[in-house]
Amino acid sequence: MEQPVGQPAYVLHSRAYKETSALVDFFTPQGRVRAVLRRARGKGGSLVRPFVPLEVELRGRSELKNVGRLDSMGIAAWLHGDALFSGLYLNELLMRLLPAEAPQPELFEHYALTLQALAAGRPLEPLLRSFEWRLLEDLGYAFALDHDVSDEPIEADGLYRLQVDAGLERVYLVQPGLFNGAELLALAQADWDAPGALLAAKRLMRQALAVHLGPKPLVSRELFRKR
């Protein structure tokens, strides 16, 4: 019989389950996995919190696994203030958008590095925008930033709107929600110092993610507004 193998993991979300157990959503290189942690008030339960690098051994073949073993694998990313809200935002995006058990090894690595950067006090906006874009790419929802839907190069003096299911479309009449070409070209190069780049990136990612997130508001976004 094949023995379960430990794998790196982070806790995305947990809640009480039955009398002494917890239902935990983990993010691992193999994707988002839900599992039951029994005796959650013991040693293992103390590790079930966000931003702690873990090694988890999961048992079972159904979609709902059982935690066989749970160990700390390093120092938790100590997030506070806006960095904490940002980390919770990343977790909520992963909970809402990741399909169950779809391997995402590169996204997992990007997530771990983003947590480290947040803990180190790096500027938040570039980190969040980079992670959002990587998430869109890995889920197959990304689009070109240097070419429009007609495969024409983005022009610095052009105006564009996002068609979420297709890409950027050039328009010639001013309307709400447009992006100028110079901003888009800066985003294609991840040039966060370019004038307007960060604000444009935030608007663009919000538009791109909205259709996949649906109408339910993000709790982490509401918490950030009320801080």
UniProtKB/Swiss-Prot annotation:
One of its GO terms (cellular component) is bacterial nucleoid. InterPro entries: ARFGAP/RecO, DNA_rep/recomb_RecO_N, NA-bd_OB-fold, RecO, RecO_C. Gene3D superfamilies: Nucleic acid-binding proteins, Recombination protein O, C-terminal domain. It comes from the Bacteria. SUPFAM superfamilies: ArfGap/RecO-like zinc finger (SSF57863), Nucleic acid-binding proteins (SSF50249). GO terms for biological process: DNA recombination; double-strand break repair. Pfam families: RecO_C, RecO_N. The keyword Nucleus does not apply. Keywords: DNA damage, DNA recombination, DNA repair. The keyword Oxidoreductase does not apply. Involved in DNA repair and RecF pathway recombination. HAMAP family: RecO. NCBIfam families: reco (TIGR00613). Belongs to the RecO family. This is DNA repair protein RecO. It comes from Pseudomonas putida (strain W619).
